[in-house]
């Protein structure tokens, strides 16, 4: 079989930078899936992407499908021939459909009978005749939320398409993609190199684009160049560039020929909080800020231009002129905001509605303040500081800086709190109240920050559930799932002695008559149980372990964590499987019992040696188990209970639980109930698989 390399490039107008990687990856994944479905072998596949092109390269692609033999079974011999041995109409019709005579058919014998058989040789289709349709289907499946039309064309795509190149080796693959006929014309850089050129061979794609078109189509190579050059440029001025990957990806997706340059701004702007300057540089201008080795912002930034200029200083000056007014705006906002304290801004919060049924932001911060102070008493934090931080937690929403740069909420509150003479703990709590903001984000660890972050999230959760607006399906407009996971993570990672039932009840009390949902407490608790499951599944904990703990509905996150660890460890023990099965059996037996069981085991009614042994073993363990469960030492308790395996196995082998004698039966049921109760102090291990 022969092989060739395939190139498919779609040349477009500038593609959305934040979608570029996903589009290219999806294009490649869709096309390789098509190749697999078509049974076309290939060695490897890669994608390339730049602002004006999506491309895929398939290496060592088979030039045709392999020939194959397809077995087509006909009627059974009994139905294929009549009593005289002549072919029936069924046999003749089947043979005719396969282009043969009945006499040419083979026989297939199995242990179930004998059938007519035709082994048809199917010649593989040439790859080049399949490529265009496969590529079009691959493009049709791209994740494009809002496709657009252009010109008089009815074709839709994420951006207007100008060129399509499909080369199998040196041969142009005939066909159209998105209404554009395939040829070998490739468009180069918009301002440098050849505006377009003909590509002679698929293998030369990257080299020709680089040398003729002044385009680095290899996305990863382009990203690596930007990163390396930016690091070198920062080091040259004694700093370190902030090369956050999301911004690095976006910049990589904005340029086809990256040139890294260094610029500066006036040092006076460094009096403005660094976060505001960084937000402006990164968010608005796509610049990389530069910090010194101590983490202090330098009056420099690194940017990437898409052209190799003969006068780079002119480009540098241009970018400095562009960023200066933005930094000046930040400076003005900061200086203006400093004239009014966070406390003085509390009155203005009365004019802003948090949610129609839940009142104003002023009412919200009063609730957060009270709840933060309440939480502080449970974790030995300063309740006055916690209440103060809660009260000031939303004042920065009324500042010019946050109104202009909304992502700086909390952060600017911290800076203004410091300027207002608030304690450092209060100031930091304002910045950390929204943490964790995303998966993988850190959680607050300072006591006052913990109190405010928990109060802020619980107020939202209980309030929104309390007015009947719980998340439905994928919709979660108030980010309640994130808030609930945040509460759990803060409690778990700080090992806090807090109970969700208590926290929910206090938050509900503070909302007062605002809440119309009578079942709010139970619904919020159930929501937390769902978040427990999601959180631990993401951590790789087995679902059956999670369900075993959830069955007991522990409402203190730290306690939940202890149970999870204990059950996960128990599951690794040799005795676990047998004891889980025994617990399941006990659970099923007890579920069928009608009426109440004896409160205690009557030793006089223990007649079989096996039940005596089990009762004795349980009695021996109970004094040891009680303090372990009281201390939430579930792992050691379950390890002790694992020693019951032999006694339990022997009991079920030798003892008839449902004895005819009612007293014996009830006593044995009481024994099993006592056994199960010990395990249930930790979890329902009958749910372990």
From Swiss-Prot:
Disulfide bonds: none
UniProtKB keywords: Aminoacyl-tRNA synthetase, ATP-binding, Cytoplasm, Ligase, Nucleotide-binding, Protein biosynthesis
Top-level enzyme category: ligase
Catalytic activity: tRNA(Gly) + glycine + ATP = glycyl-tRNA(Gly) + AMP + diphosphate
One function term, GO molecular function aspect: arginine-tRNA ligase activity
Family matches, as InterPro entries: DALR_anticod-bd, Gly-tRNA-synth_bsu, Gly-tRNA-synth_heterodimer
Protein location: Cytoplasm
Superkingdom assignment: Bacteria
GO biological process: arginyl-tRNA aminoacylation; glycyl-tRNA aminoacylation
EC number from the UniProt entry: 6.1.1.14
Listed GO CC annotations: cytosol
Residues spanning the signal sequence: none
Similarity annotation: Belongs to the class-II aminoacyl-tRNA synthetase family.
Quaternary data: Tetramer of two alpha and two beta subunits.
Record-linked PANTHER family: GLYCINE--TRNA LIGASE, CHLOROPLASTIC_MITOCHONDRIAL 2, GLYCYL-TRNA SYNTHETASE
Protein name: Glycine--tRNA ligase beta subunit
Lineage per the UniProt record: Bacteria, Pseudomonadati, Pseudomonadota, Gammaproteobacteria, Alteromonadales
